[in-house]
Amino acid sequence: MNPHATPVLVLSLALGTTITISSNHWVLAWTGLEINTLAIIPLISKSHHPRAVEAATKYFLTQAAASALVLFSSMTNAWATGQWDITQLNHPTSCLLLTAAIAIKLGLVPFHFWFPEVLQGSPLMTALLLSTLMKFPPLTLLLMTSKSLNPALLTAMALASAALGGWMGLNQTQTRKILAFSSISHLGWIAIILVYSPKLALLTFYLYTIMTSAVFMALNKIKALNLSMVLTSWTKTPVLNATLMLVLLSLAGLPPLTGFMPKWLIIQELTKQEMTPAAMAIAMLSLLSLFFYLRLAYHSTITLPPNSSNHMKQWYTSKPPSTPTAILASLSILLLPLSPMIHAIV
């Protein structure tokens, strides 16, 4: 791919995201989603590997179907109510169609099948965009229409996402697939609280974005595409690997790390809403995800590959330090004491 094309595509992604999150009209929001889809496809397929082309094709087909559903939902609502305003989604059929469309775009269960496959075929930094930035516009649409959505349907999808995200990640050896199922599991936590506290759902997404970005950037630094490559990277970048372990534990939601904050606040809010069984179920299902995070963390630091003693520790490293990775990793680990302030601001 032409090197000058990448900045144009990244700017297009920023433009599409900005249009969607700042619009009040359904057609403008749909336009932003389409710009995003068309801008990310060349980034997915830029390696020209058959798997990358396959991933780009799968992504295009699913996103095109979801965008058509968004448009159909808004047209049905406009036909019934005469309103094109995003916040005026009052028609029950339109609400159901929109929930399905956004679930496809986000990769929520039962529309999650495309997401791990697309992530597996993408480069690590494109996978980072797919897991974080590309989820922001559809999530914004859900937040803007949260008062019209069906809480029972979203709770069922959320619990299914937390369950399948945990179960399907258990036997994975590819880091991108592990992070794809991690994303599905986290989306379950966001979806379950969306109707009751949209601000808390947004806070959860922000913290998930920070932690996932730190993991992807660390994996990109050590060029680790599977568990065995993570295993052999300890001798070259010990500090980065130790940091990666802490960020993974934060992503799992262990105290006293940042990732514990959203889980704690969501369980508290669900209990206030008299949804204690749902809170208990999603808390138990997060133990499934904890297992594969622990396995990845164990591979990244504790278990060393068998090799000769003179190769165990290298005093030099060819990898220069990365400031964004350091900042994101620090935020992923140290934000829990600031929970009251962050919750008050958001």
Curated annotation (Swiss-Prot):
It catalyses: a ubiquinone + NADH + 5 H(+)(in) = a ubiquinol + NAD(+) + 4 H(+)(out). Keywords: Electron transport, Membrane, Mitochondrion, Mitochondrion inner membrane, NAD, Respiratory chain, Translocase, Transmembrane, Transmembrane helix, Transport, Ubiquinone. The chain crosses the membrane at residues 1-21, 25-45, 60-80, 95-115, 124-144, 149-169, 178-195, 200-219, 242-262, 274-294, 326-346. Its EC number is 7.1.1.2. GO terms for molecular function: NADH dehydrogenase (ubiquinone) activity. GO terms for biological process: mitochondrial electron transport, NADH to ubiquinone. It holds the Pfam family NADH_dehy_S2_C. It is a multi-pass membrane protein. It is found in: Mitochondrion inner membrane. It comes from the Eukaryota. One of its GO terms (cellular component) is mitochondrial inner membrane. InterPro entries: Complex_I_Subunit_2, NADH_DH_su2_C, NADH_UbQ_OxRdtase_chain2, ND/Mrp_TM. The keyword Isomerase does not apply. Core subunit of the mitochondrial membrane respiratory chain NADH dehydrogenase (Complex I) that is believed to belong to the minimal assembly required for catalysis. Complex I functions in the transfer of electrons from NADH to the respiratory chain. The immediate electron acceptor for the enzyme is believed to be ubiquinone. Belongs to the complex I subunit 2 family. This is NADH-ubiquinone oxidoreductase chain 2. It comes from Anas acuta (Northern pintail). The gene is MT-ND2.
